[in-house]
Amino acid sequence: MKLIIISGRSGSGKSIVLRSLEDLGYYCVDNIPVNLLPTLTHTVADEYDQVAVSIDVRNLPKDPNELVEILDYLPSTWEMTILYLDASDDVLIKRFSETRRLHPLSKQNKSLSGAIQAESQLLAPIAERADLYIDTDQLSIHQLAELVRERILGKKSSRLVLVFESFGFKHGIPKDADYVFDARFLPNPHWEPDLKPLTGLDSPVEIFLGSQPIVTKFIWQIQNLISTWLPHLERNNRSYVTIAIGCTGGQHRSVYVVEMLAKTFSTSHPDVQIRHRELNR
């Protein structure tokens, strides 16, 4: 049985995620008080094998220790995943301004900016327990729904999921990355006229980068690092590890390196996922 707990700051996309899971067959409950969570799970345990609930700042206990006790009281037979959504303060302010919605904490005589910052502190206990963190800054509604399907429903087992993500430094480092590697020192296909319009998924770019000893060594050293520490990460009960590879624009070098790493680890690891952030823009 699976239980997905969705939380995050207001405006980060919790409702979108919940609707996506409902479309995929999950029994969904929106904004349930945390102290009712054990009752809900015990009630539906015999009727549903996939349940998703969203929890916002209004439904958290004041004592962080109480939250831990409630989560620990949930049925041990359930496979629980805590998904935490977030976005930058500027993006959240923009979203509230566009929708003209009131922030849940605005009734406490706080400015919108102050309410957003206060919410971050109040949600810290559940954010710290999150198995999966998703930054929705640059995601459309459809991209967020697809990412959730990929990250959660794409899991093939209870083992740790390796996520390899390419990105461009000029667009910012992914906030959900556990490890970040800089590939900007590698030979750049951008300066080759025939390769410039292509991506790291195209054969000519693969041949160009694959023939460079420095590229091969870079990939091998990342493989060695991840392989060395992967058993320790698994023993730590991690659900996801995101390895982000960045180049300038996220089009050639980082894409190629991610593809090579994913290809290598997929032969020995049951759950490997790929995301090319800039190619999906």
From Swiss-Prot:
UniProt binding sites for ATP: G8, R9, S10, G11, S12, G13, K14, S15
Protein name (database record): Nucleotide-binding protein Patl_0571
NCBIfam families: PRK05416.1
Record carries keyword Cytoplasm: no
Signal peptide: none
Superkingdom of source: Bacteria
Protein's organism: Pseudoalteromonas atlantica (strain T6c / ATCC BAA-1087)
InterPro entries hit by this protein: P-loop_NTPase, RapZ-like, RapZ-like_N, RapZ_C
Keywords, sorted A to Z: ATP-binding, GTP-binding, Nucleotide-binding
UniProt similarity note: Belongs to the RapZ-like family.
An MF annotation (GO) of this entry: ATP binding
Entry binding sites for GTP: D56, V57, R58, N59
Function noted in UniProt: Displays ATPase and GTPase activities.
